[in-house]
Curated annotation (Swiss-Prot):
Its main location: cytoplasm. Its cofactor is Mg(2+). NCBIfam families: PRK00203.1. This is Ribonuclease H.
Length: 150
């Protein structure tokens, strides 16, 4: 039987594009693991995707994952848009290249290793897991900007 894992992810950007960070909080059997990082010049959508990718990459064996995001972009991309992007060779309905296709392809690869249930929550309304992921993403931004945390 595979482990059940909750994964809360978020991305943040100071300027868009600008310095950005991603955060992921993994919860399995009451044990929590925090992950975060950042990039000097990126977008909020790239950081949202990276949070989900890095969280899933951290799982060393197939798991049943409930992935919680406050990003409509990630949620709709993975659950609605991706199937058609793939059919069209990573092009949009307007025949334009899919933005962030490199990250969407990495996310698709990671999702294929697990059973993932996607859950969207409204951001910044006090959802504990989402708030923690937001704090981690902002830590990633701060580290890129040279701001240290205790």
């Amino acid at each position: 039987m595979s482990d059940s894992v909750e994964l809360f992810t978020d991305g943040a950007c100071k300027g868009n594009p600008g310095p950005g960070g991603w955060g992921a909080l993994l919860v399995c059997k009451g044990v929590e693991k925090e992950l975060w990082g950042g990039e000097a010049n990126t977008t909020n959508n790239r950081m949202e995707l990276t949070g989900a990718i890095r969280g899933l990459e951290e799982l060393k064996r197939p798991c049943e994952v409930t992935l919680v995001t406050d990003s409509q972009y990630v949620m709709k991309g993975i659950t609605e848009w991706m199937v058609n992007w793939k059919k069209r060779g990573w092009k949009t309905a307007a025949k334009e290249p899919v933005k962030n296709a490199d990250l969407w392809q990495l996310l698709d690869e990671q999702v294929s290793r697990h059973t993932v249930k996607w859950q969207w929550v409204r951001g910044h309304i006090g959802h504990p897991g989402n708030e923690r992921a937001d704090q981690l993403a902002n830590r990633g931004v701060d580290e890129v900007r040279g701001i240290r945390h205790g």
